Amino acid sequence: MLKRFRPVSLILLVGALGFSGNLYATPMSGIPRVDISQQNAKVSGIVEDALGPVTGASVIVKGTTNGTMTDLDGHFTLDNVKKGDIIQISFIGYTSQDIPYTGQSEITVKLVEDTQKLDEVVVTALGMKRDKKALGYAMQELKGDDLLASREPNLANSLSGKVSGLQIVRSSNGVGGSSKIVLRGNNSLTGSNQPLIVVDGTPMDNFTGGVDDVWGNSGADMGNGLSDINPEDIESMTVLKGASAAALYGSRAGNGVILITTKSGRKNEGLGITINAGITAETIFLKPDLQNDFGQGSVGVYDNQSRLSWGPKAMGQMVTDWRGNQIPLHTYDNIDAFFRTGTSFNEGVSFQQNIKGTAVFASVNRSDDASITPRSKLNKTNITLRATTFLDEAEKWKVDAKVNYINQNAHNRPIQGVNPSNAFNTIYNLPRSLNIREFEDDVDEQGNMIWYDASKNPQENPYWVTRYRQNEDTRNRLLGNISLKYAPTDWFDIELRGGTDYYTTTKSEKVYAGGNTSPRGLYTEGSETFYENNFSFLATARKDNLIDRLGGFVTFGG
């Protein structure tokens, strides 16, 4: 049964994607070679693999900056290519190929995944371990240590650059912002394109994005569900790339599946203790390329009430500012002046022990994050307990139970989109000759917001927003599962599994009087609840060497 209360919002997300990898190319069948007499020519083509077109493959003339990427249909066009140039095509997880250009006008590139690890034993769509070479679908496995290398607070971001065909689209809101996962490109224009997330056999809700304010503007980015998982608790992660790989989970797995296997207790007697602590910092990496020659105004004329930056050239000449003071006309870097370096502190401890045949795992993790936006912070506590034991001496009956509790508190999440309270949007549109630091003293004697534009346009002083437009949210989440497995023989077993995903989120917004959009003040409060229960039954029979070297593998369940 599913119960969900959630408003719908439109969010603009910005991300970056890097590419490398392995592939090979063959001339496109049925297309004749064309010798081009011009010195510079245009080359078109398509990049595919066994499952169809590939989005985002890198195509570049080797040794130059002349390059492009494939579009949603895998097509590319590369200009200014000369005979003798080497066209280099690469993508994560595939063998890069250098193709000599001899005058052909079109090429087809067929990607082949790395086959060096075909003998690996991996976790499949049904949660069972099988030889990778025996699978009939594309998949890729990552170990927990691979995900910890980048020390990303959001688990989704740890996948960036590690899985072929996977794109991470990050929010620009920094720590606590949402991240979208897309496998092999978008499949729908209106629906979700994200893969299904399954943790220890139980699907979890990977909600993404934020909520709109009471006026319909884009509001705070509430993050995404996968960020609730503690990366330190993960044993491995398996990415299943085809819909056929997820038969157990139905149509919602049509965009692929990400299987997460968490750590369990020790197999042998003894106690294992792991302590971790880390700190990461983040700053704005890319800023808009703004002109810094002209000051406030338009058509070369200075206007201290204008929102434009096409006034006179800023050369230090004296002008009358919005306060009526005489000041020299200069331009300022307001983005660096307002935003700060974000920090993320993470510390945790975990225990693994085998107590009289029962393997126990327990962990506690705490993270404290400060955003690049002043007065914005996020605190999270993650507690996990897992126990695995056999019910009989013959070890035919096995029970595995786990519970994971997450408490998250956010204060003043950054506002996004075209909302007048979006600090970045306001600073981006601020006239170049205005210094944002002038507005740190953000209220007058009557308590009204101080701003340069007397017309009371929808913009709001970013410093005032961080102090007097406050949003709070608290989420409490419980992820739990239990399984009972009976194996009467070494080639046949039956498993019953049940799992739950339950969380409540409370949100509030408090706006003080004196602002532009809510001059009399505003207070709102709300909550939402989500829960989903899943139950499954699975019978598995596997036998090697049934006839000579021919084996068999059969599963049945629902």
Language-model segments: residues:
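An active-site-proximal structural segment forming one wall of the substrate-binding cleft
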Residues: 492
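Short, small/polar-rich motifs associated with maturation and membrane association
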Residues: 1-385, 389-401, 479-480
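Surface-exposed loop/interface segments of Gram-negative outer-membrane beta-barrel transport/assembly proteins
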Residues: 117, 133, 193-194, 199, ...
